[in-house]
Amino acid sequence: MKRLFLLLITLPLLLCGCGEPNATQTIFAMDTVMTFQVWGTDAPQAVQRISHTISDLESCYNREGLARGAADPAVLQEALDLSRRTGGAFDPQLGSVTALWNFTAEDPKIPTAEQVRDALQEKTWDLGGALKGYAGQKCADILKEMQIDRAILNLGGNVQTYGQKRDGTPWQVGIQNPQGGDPVGILAVEGTASVVTSGDYQRFFEMDGVRYHHILDPKTGYPARSGLHSVTVICRDGMTADCLSTALFVMGLEQGSAFWRESRDFEAVFLTEDGKIYATQGASLSGCDYEVIRR
C-alpha cells in the first residue's frame, strides 16, 4: 500500500512588486503548514493576531470542539446553507464517514460497504471542507480592522489575498501541478480574495493500484470519482470558496460548469484526470492552454 499525506500543500506565489514583507510567520495548524506574509506598520501585531485566531478557530471547530458545542451556530448554519445550495455535493455532516476512512492514519484501511452505509446515517459535523476558508475570511477582517496595507496568507491549499500590491498589479497565484514541479497555470487575482484548491493528490492512499483520496462523495460515502484531479475556486468570501471547491470536485466538469453558469459570485478552474484545463470566463489564467467555460 502506498500512502501520501501532504502536510504542506503550497500554491506557488509570485509576489513581484511587493518587496519584503514587514512580518512573516509559519505555523502548523488544521493539519497543514500555514505561512503569513504581511506588509504594513502594524504587521508584527497583525501576524500575532492571525496566529491566535487560527488556533482559536481550530479548537472550536475540530472534532472535540464541535462535540462540546464550541462552534458558532451562525457558521454551522452557513455551512448547511452552502450544502443546500450545492444540492448536497458539499456536506458538513460527514464526520462519521471521514473518521471511518481516517486518511491521516499510519495504516488506513478501506471500510466495508456496511460500515460506510451506517456512517452515512449518523450525520455528525465535520467542517474540514469549510474551516480554512472561514479562517481566511476572519483573518482578512482582522487585517482590515488593523488598517494593514497588504497581505498574502497561505493556509495550506487555501490562499487569502488582502489589499493591493504596491505596484498595482494583481496577485499571482499558481495552481499546483498534481505531478509536482512547476504550476500548471497562474491566476491573476485582484485585491482581497480567496483562492482555494481541492485535489485528489492532497491526501490519499493507494491499495491494489486504486487511489483513495479524501474528497468524499456525500451520496456514496466513498472518494468522489468525477474525472477531475483538482478544482480551484476564486471568490471574495473564503468559506464559500472552500465549500464550493469541494462541491465542484464532487460534481465533476459538466455539472460543475452548469452550477457556475447559474451563479455570479465565483470563478473556477478545473483540471481533469486526462490533463486538460478548463477555466470559467471570468478567471484570469495564464501560462497554460485551456478551454474557456462560457455562460
Regions found by a protein language model. Give the residues of each.
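Mature catalytic core of soluble alpha/beta enzymes
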Residues: 2-295
